[in-house]
Amino acid sequence: MAGQFTVRFNKKYCFVFITAWSASVRLMVNTFVVSADLEACAKALDYRRLGKQRVEAYQLWRALMGMTKGWVHHPATLMWKGHTCFLAKYCNTMIIEWQARGYKNNMALLPTCINPRPPWWWGWEPVIKSHQASLNRKMPDFYHFEVGSWKEWGYVWPSKVPERLRLLDVGPEHLEIERA
């Protein structure tokens, strides 16, 4: 069954009532990490994903800063826990690339630290390859990352990786992730 919803309006508000939702339709938030270099991450993204990254990184930052209750338990939020300064830098890098491409931007840069410390997983191949593989599947005409055995696997969520496996050179078969 596809997602069904009803929209009702009054003079001030628009209400959306979700009456049924399919497991195949997911609300998703993510930050794509396709390189250990922030600028390279931003430059590698297509127009649509780059635009979304600005908003999604901002939403995750707000959740981590306690400014909203949305997304607080999502793996994408948990992977940035303790690294709000680096997440702000990620968000700002997406905004700067968005503007450099000539698109109109209505988002302010987030406050950040002088030298933010990246999360433990930043630059870890399983995270990078799983995100590259996801983008290859989303837009095969645009993305052509070489992902090897990661081709058929889902995201590696750093918050779900057991400490004993963190930073090891492991393939998708060693991590508890679902096939895409």
Question: What is each PLM-predicted segment?
Answer:
Residues F5:
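Cationic, low-complexity basic patches in intrinsically disordered or flexible, solvent-exposed regions
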Residues S22-A180:
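Expand to "…catalyze enediolate/carbanion chemistry for C-C bond making/breaking, isomerization
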